[in-house]
A protein has these predicted regions:
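Histidine/acidic-residue-rich catalytic or RNA/ligand-binding cores of hydrolases
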Residues: 1-2, 52-55, 106-114, 183-186
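Acidic/polar loop patches that form or flank catalytic/metal-binding clefts of enzymes
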Residues: 33-43, 95-99, 204-210
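A glycine-rich phosphate-binding loop feature that marks nucleotide/adenosyl-phosphate handling sites
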Residues: 41-52, 101-107, 211-216
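Active-site beta-loop-alpha junctions enriched in small/polar residues
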Residues: 44-47, 73-75, 100-103, 174-178
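Aromatic-lined glycan-binding groove of carbohydrate-active enzymes
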Residues: 82-174
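C-terminal functional modules
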Residues: 140-269
Length: 269
């Protein structure tokens, strides 16, 4: 804008958009600090402005040591950003895991043309949300297998230091409204997403997370997931329907095969 251009000229930073951005951030930070308020924002506020845009991984030290809270969101599998929250936490920043590949309710779970939502962060199903290990994202063997993540990729990623676990203060789900055209679609995106997310956010870690042997961990994961999804399908959804009624649910279509003249079908819940 002409105002920004004049400001940059007056402050001898013509063409340096990172400097302009940091000046703006400083004004916001100082204003909030004067009210004893904590500055919060998407983790983009700590990333350098480059042509990579939202795929950038270079962290500025501009706010190093300052009291800010980062919501770390863009972590599509294989995109080089799964470990960003650990990088921030290891640098001392307080963070909230807001993963687009698991905690965005508007992400569709497959290529079904009847789905309403987006897929720019991959296809995220309910198991993707449930299997997130907040403190070790690659401990999730389901997500690793589903997205063909290599051993080399995992080994090159930053790990969270045990001394910095307290810098991850929680998780957060998001729902964006670009494709929400009516109340039914809103219900559809919330249910049963909010049930699965609440289990992840408020319950203690499932047993599979602490199983050291990889094969045994996968067996335990599948067993616990099967138990949880049956609880949703047989108890939780019928209870909610009985109490509230009239809600729209996102229930993925069943898969089926015909074998020996019999139909075999499966369902998500």
């Amino acid at each position: 804008s002409p105002i920004c251009n004049k400001f940059m000229e007056d402050n001898s930073i013509v063409g340096d958009y990172n400097a302009l951005y940091e000046m703006m951030q400083t004004r916001v930070y100082n204003k909030l600090s004067s009210y004893n308020a904590t500055m919060t924002g998407w983790d983009d506020i700590l990333l350098k402005l480059t042509e990579k845009n939202q795929s950038e991984t270079q962290i500025k030290d501009f706010f190093k040591g300052d009291d800010i809270l980062l919501f770390v969101w863009k972590n599509d599998w294989g995109g080089g950003r799964q470990d960003m929250i650990y990088k921030y936490a290891n640098l001392g920043y307080k963070t909230v895991m807001s993963n687009s590949s698991a905690f965005y309710f508007d992400m569709v779970d497959d290529k079904d043309l009847d789905n309403v939502g987006l897929s720019w962060s991959g296809y995220a199903d309910y198991k993707d949300m449930w299997t997130v290990d907040v403190f070790d994202i690659f401990n999730d063997s389901y997500g690793v297998k589903k997205n063909n993540i290599s051993k080399e990729y995992i080994e090159s990623s930053e790990k969270l230091k045990s001394t910095n676990r307290d810098n991850i203060i929680g998780i957060q789900s998001q729902i964006w409204s670009e494709t929400i055209r009516n109340e039914d679609i809103l219900d559809y995106m919330f249910m049963p997403n909010i049930i699965v997310f609440s289990q992840k956010a408020w319950s203690k870690d499932p047993k599979w997370i602490s199983v050291q042997d990889k094969n045994e961990r996968e067996i335990t994961l599948d067993y616990e997931w099967n138990k949880f999804r049956n609880t949703i399908g047989q108890r939780v959804l019928p209870m909610i329907e009985n109490i509230y009624g009239g809600l729209s649910y996102d229930l993925p279509k069943p898969g089926g095969i015909i074998k020996n003249d019999s139909l075999y079908a499966n369902s998500a819940f």
